[in-house]
Amino acid sequence: MKMKLTLDGIKDKKSWEAAGVVLPSYDIEKVKEETKKSPAWVHFGIGNIFRIFIGGIADTLISNGAMDKGITCVETFDFDVVDKIYAPYDNLVLGVTLKADGSTDKKVIASLTEAIKAQSNVEAEWNRLKEIFQNKDRAR
């Protein structure tokens, strides 16, 4: 069984469940679309702790129906994070939590809906960032 951490890859639910990985219970594409249209949560600095901790909190809130939008992720320093960690995996995260008894909880976190480089010399990235903060429909 070959599993891929991508939006297409997680459609093979049986393989992921057999591996003990919990998949998002919500419509990922709908959350991505709503977030892109009207961003509500923008986070600067998108490293490991952010992905599992803050991303995990947002994922739980979306799963519970307390939020209908994900997080717009902005990297200000190490742009390879976007290119090598976010983009190849469709912004999905495999969260593994080690518990005190040595067991693990594994889940796919899909709340990180867009990853942007705060790179002013790359017109598309910079324009998207400006668009987010100029969006009058953006939740306040």
Listing of model-derived features with the role each one plays in the protein:
Residues 1-140:
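Non-transmembrane, aqueous-exposed alpha-helical and coiled segments at domain scale
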